[in-house]
Amino acid sequence: MYLADLHIHSKYSRATGRDADIPHLDLWARRKGITLVGTGDFTHPAWREELAQTLEPAEEGLYRIKKEARLADVCELAVSPRFVLSGEISCIYKQDGKVRKVHNVILLPSLDAAERLAFKLETIGNIRSDGRPILGLSSKDLLAITLGVCPDAVFIPAHIWTPHFSMFGAFSGFNSVEECFGDLAPHIHALETGLSSDPLMNRRVEMLDRYTMVSNSDAHSPAKLGRESNLIDAPLSYPALKKALETGEGFAGTLEFFPEEGKYHLDGHRNCHLCLTPQQTEQYGGRCPVCGKKITVGVLHRLEQLAQRPEEYVPAGAKPFEHLMPLPEVIAASLGVSAAGNRAERLYIKLLSQLGPEAQILRETPLSDVERAGGSRIAEGIRRLRAGRVIKSAGFDGEYGKISLFTPEELKNAGGQLSFLGEIAVAEAEPAALSPENAAPAAQTEAAPGKTDSGRRANAAQWAAAESKARVTAVIAGPGTGKTFTLTERIARLVEKGVKPEEICAVTFTVRAAEEMRERLRARVKRADKITVGTFHSICYGLLRGEVSLAERSLQLKLAAEVIAEYGLKCAPRRFLGDVSAYKNGKGETSEGIAEYCRRLRAAGAADFDDLIALALEKKNKTFGWLHVDEFQDVNAKQYELVMQWAGERGKLFVIGDPDQSIYSFRGAVGDCFQRLLCDRPDAEVIRLTESYRFTPQVLGCALQAIGANGGERALVPVKAPGAAVRLAECPSGMSEGIFVAKEIARMVGGLDMFGRGREEKLHTFGEIAVLARTHRMLRVVEDCLRKEGIPCLSASDGAFLEAPEVSGTLAFFGALAGGGESAQAETFLGGREAFDRAKEKFTPLLRARPRKILAQWGEYMHINSAAYQQLSDAAHYADLPEFLEAMRMGGDGDVLLPGGNTSAGAVRLATLHGAKGLEFPVVFLCGANKKLLPPETADEAEERRLFYVGITRAQDELIITTSGEPSPFLAEIEGTVKRENAHPKPQYRQLSLF
């Protein structure tokens, strides 16, 4: 029989000791008497590298320290400690309308399995900044991924009762294993009890009978090993351990903390020094009687909510357990000294050297031997511990409880006779002179805003637009007024009235918007796939399919580099291609270099992205009977010409958009499309949508004041109930803006760990939060801060990752496979035709799989794990490979990097103000509202103000604007609609007392 502590952390986790490495873990395992130790943190690449360097294989699936890494010590075991690969992952996500924060422990049989699982998880989120990574992934999805990579893995929900971060936790947990894991619940065989509960408590919950209830230390430093551990009566091997945990055969019981010593045993509010029993919490309505804030509901209270059995119930076949205290604490409690002091440490080492490891001393060593080595007081302390005769002061709200072995009087009277103490009940913490009648009033909770029925019933203006019979209809739709709904409803009603789907076309501004439109139409009408839906470029490419070959990005860069070299131009290929695009969109001038590039592109038999519009204009006979154009304010001159051509003389044209959101002049957008249309088609019917469903009145008021300086009247009316004030945080620097945002996000999700959890009335998931900025540079500052804080995020980019060789080569390979196109670039990337054929044979059967799955397997096959490839994987949220490849060719900034709501992993979204167009989030941080940055000095002020307006109107409920240095002039224009705050208040100085 041996002791196993399977849940610990390394020095790569937050709030851990610097000595949490293998040599010190091995040393302390010997001192504690633990034979099997989890490595912890297997997801962290630096830790895995250390494990590979300091460990060597032992029994099947287990490792031991290499001799050269071993530290000498006073205490030895008959068998040197073994290590098993383990790690803890924090899952923060939304399920069933509630934010869930669940920690899970995973055991693996090898370093290779750890490497493979870590690789898979790195395509989902950031696993490098913390040994216990935070993923916006459900526990069920994490379990599925784990078993998919390693079927022999053991998956254990961690410290299941902890209030803020566990499967059954009071604030974010579930009521059953099935509720958490769904149809994968049968794969859960063991649950971890946590320090604040013990088997006696857990036996009261009948549904736990079928699980192996394990106990581990969750140690953040080697000296904390073995606070709780498991007794295993089975051979030393991973298969035997797995069997013991999954079947209970060979699982002999646990060594336990006194649950009262755990820091979440009782209820309470630490800031008000208030500890409550579950009954008292109910008496006060769950609110602190001192300050009125929510009380942290402890483990005992939560367990009682799910318990069906009385206290002291012992089911048949229950495993034995023992309550223990760490030996240094026993020494300190017996002598009245500090457990971390020199005297306690000297006695501890002396006892180990003379009597053996700690677990043996506490459980088995004759008390006479203890008395000879350490004195009568320590022997008596151990006697009382073994008998369970201890004094308990329970922990609450993150504050550890205290277990005493002697009364203060006994400690003072060191020479007096020692007597056994009766069990002392937990003292109830009665709030002084407070009762429910005179307690502070509970915080008032607002009634939830009534759900609008805009998803099912149109308002009067929306209905008028959907039913319009005019040959040309122009709809002015401000933000949040149901633009996409109105457009979808109109198309659906046309089909219901007998219009053939093949005669209908809907042009969107982004691939993502086209995807959303298709999904809505599929849910609304039959034969929706027959309706033409796409961006200008994707529709043009479809019309020209078979007539034109679209140049891969690598070919464009190659031709650009050749022209730059030949003409001695002083610019990078990427910048040159930007100039070419501007020229083709009517925003730039031609040059000899640009003309030569276009000639070479034609000679290669290819066209680029911007050629598609011009080529489509040559097909004069192509028209649509019912043409719909979304985001009409953003079309450029050639696209406008194409709209008029596609509508023809007999077709019906329906355009919708918001002139206040015209922000793409740099791409050729003319900005006056609505005015031009009304001049060209004076018979057009103009309809205005004015009821805004997206924002609170506070956000909408700020937005209207921001855009007001551009002139004109706007009649937007908020439908939502009032919400939080718009905040303006003034920071000392750009870096402090990033730090402020990271800390605020951590607060909004209720804290990232048990050291910094928040006390929010309403919690958000990471996926409900966005960070927007004018430039990628500002976003990179914020991103660094988020990643250092361990917050998962989808990073913004200027698209440069698409030019990385491993990315362009990957897209070329799958483009050749999926479309049967030219394979020359892919062959070059793979190193020849033979390598291409091998890869083709392996991946052709996978072409129908989801793009994320394909890219994950391709990354393993090609050993690709670069940041650029990870960005490609982040963007692979499409339903099938052709759609994904088209998006990579056609998509804008937001399409590639912000996959909307389709990702299974929740992450904070980072986007430029341009890239965020069309998105909306419950919470938005708008960063870098500084002079010369928003707006830039050379920019058109009116368009930059529209861009600021777009940023503000991405926020549904909460908007936080940050600034540093000299503020943007736009901030003066919204004065009165924002609540200012100093993100770094100056320290308050006071005279220190001499005493």
Segments the model singles out, each with a brief description of its role:
Residues 481-484, 622, 626-629, 633-709, ...:
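Conserved helicase motor core of SF1/SF2 NTP-dependent helicases
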Residues 474-491, 682-685, 692-791, 818:
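Helicase P-loop NTPase motor core
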Residues 503-578, 591-592, 604, 743, ...:
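Conserved P-loop NTPase-based nucleic-acid remodeling module centered on helicase motor cores
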Residues 451-467, 471-475, 481, 485-486, ...:
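Accessory N-terminal region flanking or inserted into the helicase ATPase core
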Residues 2, 27, 45, 56, ...:
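C-terminal functional module detector
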Residues 783-785, 804, 811-981:
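Conserved helicase C-terminal RecA-like lobe
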Residues 13, 20, 48-189, 420:
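Extended substrate/RNA-proximal surfaces in nucleic-acid metabolism proteins
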Residues 446-547, 648, 701, 953:
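P-loop NTPase Walker
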